[in-house]
């Protein structure tokens, strides 16, 4: 619904650049607290999101850790240059590396509950989601990386 939601093309050559640019664009549009949420986290609730916005009043960064070592949510109340765009993603040390960088910058951080995000077929099982495919190869084509 174009009257209710604004849509924007993501800009950047990789995930980190796209996330960083999203924050830059939103702050340029005069938003004062911004939260990015991954679309592959089925257990996220409105209470978690509300808690994130609440904690941004007290902290520089909020992070929702994912069980696989990444994160499903990140929020800021001001842009932090190159926090997200100069790093690699898709490995189990993503969260730890980001938290190290946040600490090096002397930023305060609040961690939301750890949740599962869906990256591979086993993640569906862990989340209690069952999807039946006629052909097992259809999983990779339709859901997998």
Across the structure, where does each feature detected by a protein language model lie?
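Short phosphate-binding loop-to-helix
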Residues: 2-33, 91-94
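Conserved catalytic core of nucleotide-sugar-dependent glycosyltransferases
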Residues: 67-82, 89
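Conserved alpha/beta core of the MobA/IspD/sugar-nucleotide pyrophosphorylase nucleotidyltransferase superfamily
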Residues: 96, 100-145
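Short aromatic-hydrophobic micro-motifs that form the base-stacking/packing surface
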Residues: 35-37
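Conserved donor-nucleotide/metal-binding helix-loop-beta segment in metal-dependent transferases, i.e.
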Residues: 44-69
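Short, glycine-/small-residue-rich phosphate/pyrophosphate-handling segment
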Residues: 80-101
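Short acidic donor-binding/metal-coordinating loop in glycosyltransferase active sites
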Residues: 39-41
């Amino acid at each position: 619904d174009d009257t209710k939601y604004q849509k924007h093309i993501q800009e950047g050559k990789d995930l980190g650049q796209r996330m960083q640019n999203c924050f830059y664009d939103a702050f340029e549009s005069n938003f004062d607290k911004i939260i990015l949420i991954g679309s592959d986290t089925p257990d996220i609730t409105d209470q978690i999101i509300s808690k994130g916005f609440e904690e941004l009043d007290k902290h520089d960064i909020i992070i929702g850790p994912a069980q696989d070592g990444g994160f499903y949510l990140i929020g800021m109340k001001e842009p932090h240059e190159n926090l997200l765009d100069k790093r690699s993603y898709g490995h189990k040390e993503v969260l730890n590396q980001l938290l190290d960088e946040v600490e090096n910058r002397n930023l305060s951080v609040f961690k939301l509950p750890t949740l599962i995000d869906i990256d591979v077929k086993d993640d569906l099982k862990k989340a209690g989601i069952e999807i039946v495919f006629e052909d097992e190869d259809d999983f990779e084509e339709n859901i997998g990386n």
